[in-house]
Amino acid sequence: IRVNLLGFGAYTANRKHFWSFDLNLRTSVSTQFPYELFHFFKTGESAQVRNLGLSSDAYAEAGFNYSFPIGEKFYVGARVKFLVGLARAKSYFTQFNVSLGENEWYAEAVGELEVNSNLLTIPTRQEAGQDGVYRNYYQLDDMEFDAKFKPAGYGAAFDIGATYEPIPNLLVSAAVNDIGFIAWNKASSMHGTVSRRLTFDGAQVDASGVADIDFDLGELKFEQVDEESATRMLHYTMNLGAEYRLWDRRVGFGALYQIHKYDYAALHNLTASVNFQPVRWFGLSG
């Protein structure tokens, strides 16, 4: 999600080069929930769950864009961005094997929690582990939010793209966005690990075999470990497009192929479009 906070731009004196500046707030969410986990919550049948994850981040970006033609058929543009990290959270389990008890359910969990933010505080509490040793565990159900703005990291990125008209009325384009990183600082870091059997209260299966299973965030016992700084790449997007126009450029047929890279997977989209613009001030797209 991109929320534009400020933006302005203008052509240079030759009316061919264009520059712009914008300020945006960016957020993204990436998930990976295996089918086996949903099957367990529906039926209560034990399942071996692997690679379960949820991540999100939020940052502000200030970008400067400049674009210009090269010859009569080629047009290029680039955008340089300064990034301010606001918040980042990632929880990932390489193992989350689930089973059902009489009034509770269990998860043999091996995973990790990473949080970078000055807008969020997760308290810890000393509890005895399975070996009887007391350790600090994050209390996820007692998270506190602080509206005070304080950056948790800084970074940089760039976008680059070009269009080319190989023959009259045919325009092809290519672009790559969000090639860059954010370096999250140690002072804003919270880091935890889990490698134990977790117990969640509230589970039953009715006569028809449908499970009613409760999930309590406070039962996720991540042991506090040493905080550390982290540098993470952004989720890039690649666009490849083509459009052909007919009837004095009033009708256009286009195709766009997109690749969105997330933490756990890459999403591929192919979109076709038809555009009709009989006059300059009116147009239809589908």
State what each model feature region is:
Residues 1-27:
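N-terminal, post-signal peptide beta-strand-biased segments of exported outer-membrane/organellar beta-barrel
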Residues 37-286:
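Outer-membrane beta-barrel porins/channels
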Residues 28-34:
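Hydrophobic alpha-helical transmembrane segments of integral membrane proteins
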